Every structure is written in structure tokens, then in C-alpha cells.
């Protein structure tokens, strides 16, 4: 089982590096995530067309970010998390305020993934 996980992580890292060569390592994975964007004008969450596997990653400059390999189209999502205060856990959503002040909501199918990923993000950014 452990050999299987090592192989799966190696294959996943190869796929991510194909799209984003600067990725150095995978920190954690969640199997299914849907992405929402907060619309300031209407004060509502809008579901985007991006959903798929979530990879918490570290790049060559030791920045923490995430990639969502989109199952619906070739448009993936790759964002960095610059500061622990930019990430919050609200209900079943991981809320991320991006560098350009957009607000992204990530809904994870498994609630255990949500809290685990949130804690790892906070811990990684505080190092």
C-alpha cells in the first residue's frame, strides 16, 4: 500500500510539473474540490467551471500554493497563498483572498480534507 502511494504521488508530481515546472513537491491532496468566486457587486458566491483534484504544493522558492486540475476543461487553477491571514475556514468552505484581492471559495467533498488542508496551510505558512 505504501509503495502504491509513493508511486501515485510521483505520477501526480510529474503531471503537475508538466503544467507548472516550478512545482517542487506535493504537500497534500484532496480528491474533489469545487471552486466558487465571490462577486462583490452582487455580494454572492458564483460557482465557476473549475472542479477536480486539489493539490497543495510547494514551489522552488518555497512558496505554498494550490493547483486544481480541472475535470471540466483544460483551464486549471494555480494560486499562491501569501499569508496565513489570507485563508479562513468558514462552514464547509476554505476561503482564500488572493494577491489581487479576489475572494475564492473552495468546497471540498470530504469535510475531513477541508480541516486537514486548512491546518496544513496555516502550519506551512507560519514556518
UniProtKB/Swiss-Prot annotation:
Q: Which family does it belong to?
A: Belongs to the DCP1 family.
* GO process annotations (BP): deadenylation-dependent decapping of nuclear-transcribed mRNA; mRNA methylguanosine-cap decapping; mRNA processing; nuclear-transcribed mRNA catabolic process; nuclear-transcribed mRNA catabolic process, nonsense-mediated decay
Key words, A-Z = Cytoplasm, mRNA processing, Nonsense-mediated mRNA decay, Nucleus, RNA-binding
The subunit structure is:
Component of the decapping complex composed of dcp1 and dcp2.
GO MF assignments: mRNA phosphatase activator activity; RNA binding
The organism of origin for this protein: Schizosaccharomyces pombe (strain 972 / ATCC 24843)
Protein name, UniProt field: mRNA-decapping enzyme subunit 1
- SUPFAM superfamilies (UniProt xref): PH domain-like
- Summarize the protein's role: Component of the decapping complex necessary for the degradation of mRNAs, both in normal mRNA turnover and in nonsense-mediated mRNA decay. Removes the 7-methyl guanine cap structure from mRNA molecules, yielding a 5'-phosphorylated mRNA fragment and 7m-GDP. Decapping is the major pathway of mRNA degradation in yeast. It occurs through deadenylation, decapping and subsequent 5' to 3' exonucleolytic decay of the transcript body.
Predominant subcellular localization, coarse grouping: cytoplasm
Annotated InterPro entries: Dcp1, PH-like_dom_sf
Q: Where in the cell is it found?
A: Cytoplasm; Nucleus
| A Gene Ontology cellular-component term | nucleus
Gene3D superfamilies registered for this protein in UniProt: Pleckstrin-homology domain (PH domain)/Phosphotyrosine-binding domain (PTB) (2.30.29.30)
